[in-house]
Amino acid sequence: MRKLVSSVAAASLLSGCGGDLAGARSILDKDELVVAVKSDQPGLAVRTSGGVFQGFDVDVAAYVAARLGKKVSFVATTSEGREAKLREGAADMVVATYSISAERKRQVTFAGPYYVSRQDILVRAGYGGIRNVRDLKGRRLCEAQGSISTSRIVDGHRIAAVLVPARTYGECVDLLRSGAVEAVSTGDLILAGFAVRERGAFAIVNAPFTAERYGIALPLGDVEGCEQVNRAITDMYQDGTAARLLDKWFGASGLQLSAFVPEFEGCTP
């Protein structure tokens, strides 16, 4: 199945951008799906120097598109740009570590989740000052634009961290490396990807405290498309593809990775 996923993704890059994105009622009416993914999250989605997107999210999107009988191509997005990609017709789906929330469900229709990640904390290797979420009080914590991870700490857990803004999690990691921040906190898959890439420069605290349910976002109201995507996600777990992809991209991180079908949100508001 890995060969199928890779070949679908490769073929998609030669097929252009898929034409009119806003004219169809549902993604099921399209011959080709344009999928927005991140471009700077190691293990999840990066764009190589040759312009090729690769990573877990990319492979998930390619698998889903293949199950729907669609060609697929990819465009880059940032956390703050995800809703706009769908609203403006620049993408048909968003697969970009997009945590499902009540507020976001008012703007997009979520299929999935395709993975339930646990929020954790990334620090510089050897730094023992942060062992759990409570230790973030008074610490400099990076806040990536468009992410709700820091809100879960400051508002949900009422921990008075000192937030330092950055545009992306890649920038957050740069700030962590330089010492401008003391921690980065978000879903463990995001943190694991950076930890593997940096080869020992950073460490995951391994004190998870909040679940992050990563959904596949569709244009608001596409219930039929959402239901079909959920069937594809179920197939991905039941045929072993999800387990293989998780091991492929994150096996070296040491994280305990779930290979069970996540409980879906439901496609209607």
State where each predicted segment sits.
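Extended ligand-binding regions for polar small-molecule ligands
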Residues: 18, 58-67, 127, 134, ...
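Ligand-binding clefts/hinges and TM-proximal coupling segments of bilobed small-molecule sensing domains
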Residues: 19-22, 148-164, 203-204, 234-269
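Periplasmic-binding protein-like
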Residues: 39, 115-123, 192, 196-234, ...
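Acidic, polar ligand-binding/catalytic clefts
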Residues: 62, 71-135
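A ligand-binding cleft/hinge motif common to bilobed small-molecule-binding domains
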Residues: 81-84, 97-106, 154, 177-178, ...
